[in-house]
Amino acid sequence: SVDYQGKPTRVFAYYSDPDLLANRPHGKKKYAGVVLLHGGAGWAFRQWVEKWAAEGYAAIAIDLCGNGPEIRPLPDGGPNLGDDEAVFMQAENGDMKRSWTYHAVSSAILAHSLLLSMKQVDADKTCLTGISWGGYLTCIVAALDNRFKAAAPVYGCGYMDELKFFDYGMSKLSADGKARWMRDLDPSVYLPYVGIPMLMVNGNTDTAFDVPQYQKSCRLIPQHFREVCIRPGMRHGHYEGWEPAEIRCFFESAVGDGYPPIRITDVSLDDSLRVSFRTGIFPYSAEFYYTNDTLSDNAHRVWHTVGGTLNREKGTF
């Protein structure tokens, strides 16, 4: 990858595809590809790669902490996500090429280039997904690398100066340092330039990425590209972040033969709430999930659910 402190770096990755998984030679068949970006306390997860390979994709997961196999530091690895100095404090001195974000974004784009160079990968069908800090990166990379055809950041969003979870880093910055972070490293700067379909996935009571800032981030994405999936009770973690079937279904709609997600086309509120939607499939059931709790923090906010009348044929609820 790109130089760090004047020296070349290498990045460890796991790669697999349906042929490798089945222990057979590559033939003429080309597969859709996916780049996988882990979050904090994570690494290049082999099982994540194998999960996507089992679902028909050529998948690559890269380590974003300068580590190699068995999570051991590489002698020529880049900065570590666990190092607050690399993640936050480079914004203080303005040396962005030493920041973790710069190196992680570069590594993700180069991993995509590697994927595209493989004869078994369909260059017109590559996707991107990341979890937590990897979701943060996905928001940035999707805006910078227009070779991707779809992206799905999980948890990660912009306006990190408003998210209390990240006070541990943001509070160390001066006013100028924080302004520099928000100008150069915050996803809110990049999301308006996303030019591919993007599915934003989060839980309603996430401990790090709050719903209000998530909503603001989603609205920065051009309307015809953005989809959002807020899952009730979704916990924060790597397994929880790669488990949602909505991600694969979304990618299938972008690079395969799948149906597009349900899209709400109109909302009216008087004595009742009425939602109109458009979809290529008939939903099995529907519920209205809401909160009027304005006092609790995001993780402890109380949500309620109420049923209604679903008309599959007319596309109303």
Task: List where the protein language model places each region.
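Gly/Ser-rich "nucleophile elbow"/oxyanion-hole loop immediately N-terminal to the catalytic nucleophile
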Residues: 25-30, 79, 83-132
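Short beta-strand/loop motif that positions the catalytic acidic residue
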Residues: 194, 200-202, 206
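Cap/lid segment of the alpha/beta-hydrolase catalytic domain
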Residues: 44-46, 50-106, 158-169
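Primarily recognizes the serine-hydrolase "nucleophile elbow" in alpha/beta-hydrolase
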Residues: 55, 109-179
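Surface beta-strand/loop "capping" patches
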Residues: 242, 249-290, 305-316
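N-terminal cap/lid segment of alpha/beta-hydrolase-fold proteins
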Residues: 1-29
